[in-house]
Amino acid sequence: MGTLHKSGLAEQAPGGTQQERVETRRKADGDTASPPLQPFLRMRNVDVARGEKIVLRRVNLEIAEGEHVAILGPNGCGKSTLIKAITSECYPIVGPGMERLIYGRERWDLMELRKHLGVVSAELPGERTPRTLGIDAVVSGFFSSSTLWPNLEVTAQMRERAEEALARMQASHLRGRWVGEMSAGETRRVMIARALVHRPAMLLLDEPSNALDLAAQRELREILRGVARTAGILMVTHQLADILPEIHRVVMMRDGEIVADGAKGELLTERRLSELFGVEVTLTERNGYWHSW
């Protein structure tokens, strides 16, 4: 990969499309029995505006289903807007050569899309829905609602899936707790369980360690490593320590543009990170996690 740059077109690693490179890596790791990965995301020349301001410029990005990717950059660089463009919470400016395909489709019904993508925002919902039980918060994921309203028809299978998702997040003990009485770390686990009720192929996480203390961050990261065994993870973060050992690809963003895209080991260097964040960075790696100061 080349140096960080401002063209909006990150240099691509050799060897075909991103999906082909992921398949090559899987085979090199000895995985020849699994079916081929499906394309999850394809973006070409995507611009997004907020009012009169362009907040994403010329985004070009491909991600395969099941791939683990971290989008890294300073606050305000456009990472969260990129996630919203993927999940159809905001829409690109239509222009020549613009393309945004999710599983090969331009348009999705949001309820249908949520069956394929689990989405967890950086916001914690405790203040908005304090009198929602943990189990009901997870079941509400089937309806894309903020809480479990009385008029919603809940099936036994939905309850079973919700219990399964809580167990997956090691949060079964929170099923009968009010969301408003949970800690930030507990709430985040419940919200990720909510995103997992459909058993999605991809999980999108926006700043997963936001508002969590050190112990809660560490616990959550280890739980997410288990999730990564059965679902792809697309993570937005400005914290190096959030990047799980299972994540092999990093996309760097600055000022609304992708400035680098490649293998984690190639991009996570002191020079590149210093350029990205605009401060001198000292870097260490321990047990597959990277740390900076």
Where are these regions (language model features)?
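Helix-to-loop junction immediately C-terminal to a conserved catalytic motif
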Residues: 87
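Conserved ABC ATPase signature
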Residues: 151-153, 178-182
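A short, proline-enriched helix->beta-strand linker immediately N-terminal to the Walker B motif
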Residues: 197-201
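Catalytic Walker B motif of ABC-type/P-loop ATPase nucleotide-binding domains
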Residues: 203-207
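ABC ATPase nucleotide-binding domains
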Residues: 271-293
